[in-house]
Amino acid sequence: TAEEVKNMVEKAHQHGIRIVFDGVINHTGPVTPQDAVWPENWVRTTPACDYKNYKNTTACTLVANLPDILTESEQNVDLPAALVEKWKKEGRYEQEVKELDAFFARTGYPRAPKYYIIKWLTDYITEYGIDGYRADTTKHLEEGVWAEFKKQCDYTFTDWKKNNPGKVLDNNAFYTTGEVSGYNISGGLYYDFGDKKVNYFANGFNSLINFEFKNEAKKDYESLFSYYSNTLQKELKGFGVLNYVSSHDDSTPFDGKREKTFESATKLLLTPGTAQVYYGDESARNLVIDGTKGDATLRSFMNWDDIKNDPSTQKTLAHWQKLGQFRKNHPSVGAGVHQKITAKPYVFSRRYSKENYSDQVVIGLDLAKGKKTISTGIIFQNGAKVKDAYSGKETVVVNGKVTIDSEFDLVLLELKK
């Protein structure tokens, strides 16, 4: 319900958690006995996409029975009769029409289908103060639509902050990430349709989901970390990628059998860029379910009982939590510059600075269990008190090195507060 959404956003914000909604402009969902197809001046029902070029990816139906919004249209259209009837039954018709009139008067847009939908999606910002959108099926409509979408999201988010000064979390702008299916970080700024390359970062997106990470994660730590750092600090400077090891509609996850849960966490959460933790990654939720069809195997029930009763699951979860908290506390981990300090043992630093803020950490992986001495490079001064956030042990930097005695084979060094 609307009240439940409101409570969810408010509770999340009270805990410093931002809310990103999934936003769709490409379609209105499948046709069912309860949900009739929308009018023909709103949607097309043929042809089906064959993805061989730009047109056959955008001006077509994504899959069977998923009518495609005519996002290329600039023609005025009336509201669908079914929607008008619904609003009148709910007693909200006059208010909805009043808001639409105000939106089109302010923006100057024609009353084309895409602009109605943009207005309806920005309503979630106006009404709840959500912080961002994950744009679904991004490549299946013209990129310019997303530029207009972001423009209206920015306007609405600024307006919401002005009207709700007590609820503002920070000065950050509205966040957008795009699901451009098949986009890879190796493509840099562009996605290639075959006959046309599109820069979605120049059309309203802060970041794009990176479909390549699950394969890149097979590399050794240094190759992985240095490549992502260099790419994000150079070609993609100012933008981001959203990495994942498993996802709701990717049938080939990095660790489908959950045999590399610790490695999955270490690589996902310590690689530069943004990390998407799919539910159950942190608890080794089963992704191989007998009798399922398609992506249903990726959407199994959460393994709450394992978290409560299984020591192995609890150990896995603790690893994800420690890395996740360290990442949360240190922007340098995901947004900073990566620098190798020593190859053996493998130790590296991350440094981040912006305006009057700076953050730096030193991380060691595949170390000896027990007592270990590692170099901290130029990150911490001699005499500095540091803490290993993984074990909780504290020590002092001496001659550019620290010694930690812990049962673990990794260290997460931060300045002791």
Predicted regions and their residues:
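Active-site-proximal helices and loops of the catalytic beta/alpha 8
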Residues: 9, 13, 27, 119-237, ...
